[in-house]
A protein has these predicted regions:
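Glycine-aromatic micro-motifs
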Residues: 1-151
């Protein structure tokens, strides 16, 4: 079993049911000294940033779910890469698999993407100031390439 820290659309129970159906939620941890951003492909990533914190959902993945989630995140194609990073949940430090975008160049979100992220943040009761930060990103003009689809 692997712990996975989700900070974007993978926080959503519905999204995870599609891409890692056996994933089990463990809790709501924080990733310290990182910031949330939207990259040029219109989806989320995190990047090192002192004194900032990213909140998300910790999922327990089976080996099979890890493979299907890696395919969805386009690890083989190089869109994201995997890293093991420390997250803190209820005062406990745990290492978790985190997907980081290869490109850290900021851009506007894909149309509809931040709606999924914000709904998931509300579903998991992430801190309201953090949700407001996410909402501010959703106010940027969305990319018109195509609407976000997670199925």
């Amino acid at each position: 079993m692997t712990l996975h820290f989700a900070y974007g659309s993978n926080m959503s129970r519905a999204v995870m049911r599609c891409h890692a159906p056996g994933a089990e939620p463990v809790g709501v941890p924080a990733l310290a000294n990182f910031r949330f951003l939207i990259t040029t492909h219109g989806h989320a990533s995190v990047a090192p940033c002192q004194a900032r914190t990213v909140y998300g959902v910790l999922w327990r993945l089976s080996a099979r779910d890890r493979v299907t989630l890696a395919a969805w995140e386009n690890i083989a194609g190089g869109l994201y890469h995997a890293a093991m990073l420390p997250v803190r949940q209820a005062g406990q430090r745990r290492l978790a698999l985190v997907y980081l975008a290869r490109s850290q160049k900021q851009a506007a979100p894909q149309s509809g993407y931040m709606d999924v992220v914000i709904a998931a943040a509300l579903e998991w009761h992430l801190p309201m100031p953090y949700i407001e930060q996410l909402r501010s990103l959703s106010l940027r003009r969305p990319r018109r390439l195509r609407a976000f689809r997670w199925m």
